């Protein structure tokens, strides 16, 4: 059953950016997709309005779903631009007085207008949403607070006749209130922003899915590439489900290419971490303007082949920011200005950045403001004083960014990626040695530059790991190293002829070092090796898989020198594990620090 359609579109068979759909009136397309289940597709044929950084211009649909069993549920009503059309069409299929539930996969100012009208007309309906969404709704509609029903992940909503909605909270930096639903009766996953496509046409389903490939990838890159970690978490939740269909928030429903698109999402997520360069994009947004700028910058970075991890400071934990900073090659911080200041979350994040990010990482600053923009100046000056280099000039946008402003953001993201590549090539060139004629062991020895490493030993089956930065090459034939360690720790058991150990040289930007200390691991304490991938050498000591290089060593001699023991060891074997990596170096401000 399909309700009247406002006309046929022009061909949509090319994914080219230059192809436009016909400019037809907006309409609502209704069809039954499963027993007791309908889709209402609000169709926009020309330029996409509500995601202004999305410039493909092939129109879109805003998909809403109606399940009519013993109880009735309406999933994801559209935004304000379709409110009147939608509320005129919906009563043809449903008496609003009998509507039991409205499920909101996410909320935003655009959708609030339609939700308000529905709540006024459907007087007994409960609004189902995540906890972050409920906070926004209660602030917007305080007089309806008792009608908002918050859910936790894996909560069930039984509609009768076999329709049981399994609700899954899926927060992302872009949609902190994200919620998906799975109907066990119809085996349909209502996926909201996942698996969608911004294309408008007459096809309800994806019969011509091969022709959607370019649009699907473009949609993923624009909306999800900067948040692949969260997308993979969502996919993990979906894995146990038996699916006949995916019902996204935009574009054709996925039935004919179900396994292919699901597999594509896995592959696209995995492609991001495999990029050689990674940027941490850290922001907070009061009214959505700074978030829009962040998405445009991320789009420029992704197009330039750089992996992006977006961190929404309003929902991120401090340890997430620390890990993102340690793992990235460059970082970009965005902030609104509220009362002449940066939000508290950004001030906290900036403190973490200044204490965690090495000076070799490239930096960027952007933000929106109403009148003065002091927050942007604050962040920029703090980073300048900290000695960081910038990948682009600070971007300042007053009020909401228009298309020209977003183009500046996208271009700045691409420029940042180019600067990052140049910056990294220069660093590699400074470190490079003549390695082509050297064997693997000599290459590994060549990585020693007063570098940070983890010494691993083993005694009677117990493995030990100690962080050190006092190491240098001591001989060429045979290759040997000199290692200084505090004497009060009995040389960590290294003061013994032919004592075996492994020196794991660490890679800059990785977080391995936070698992170790300059003191031996306590006997009954937490064992970091249980959390780190590793394997044993022939001498029984451990190699850390994330190390830049490793050296298998034998102690030849040692001397007590002041408050330290100086150990000389010969290198028996070694290998560079990350040929393109950079050696992590300890920068000290005082010679009295270990």
From Swiss-Prot:
Q: Which residues form the Flavodoxin-like domain?
A: 279-417
Annotated region (Flavodoxin-reductase-like) at 445-594
Going by the record, the broad EC class of this enzyme is: oxidoreductase
Cofactor(s) recorded in Swiss-Prot or TrEMBL: Fe cation
E.C. designation(s): 1.-.-.-
Q: Can you quote the record's cofactor note? A: Binds 2 iron ions per subunit.
Chain residue ranges for the region called Zinc metallo-hydrolase = 57-250
Enumerate the CDD domains for this protein.
flavodiiron_proteins_MBL-fold
Identify the keywords attached in UniProt to this record, alphabetized.
Answer: Electron transport, Oxidoreductase, Transport
Keyword Transport assigned: yes
Q: Give this protein's Gene Ontology molecular function annotations.
A: electron transfer activity; FMN binding; oxidoreductase activity, acting on the CH-NH group of donors, NAD or NADP as acceptor
**PROSITE patterns listed in its UniProt record:** FLAVODOXIN (PS00201), FLAVODOXIN_LIKE (PS50902)
Q: PANTHER family in the record, alphabetically? A: DIFLAVIN FLAVOPROTEIN A 2-RELATED (PTHR32145), DIFLAVIN FLAVOPROTEIN A 4-RELATED (PTHR32145:SF32)
* Protein family: In the N-terminal section; belongs to the zinc metallo-hydrolase group 3 family. In the C-terminal section; belongs to the flavodoxin reductase family.
What more does the record tell us?
By homology with NorV in E.coli, may be involved in nitric oxide detoxification.
User: What is this protein's function per UniProt?
Assistant: Mediates electron transfer from NADH to oxygen, reducing it to water. This modular protein has 3 redox cofactors, in other organisms the same activity requires 2 or 3 proteins.
| This protein's name | Putative diflavin flavoprotein A 4
Q: Which gene encodes it?
A: dfa4
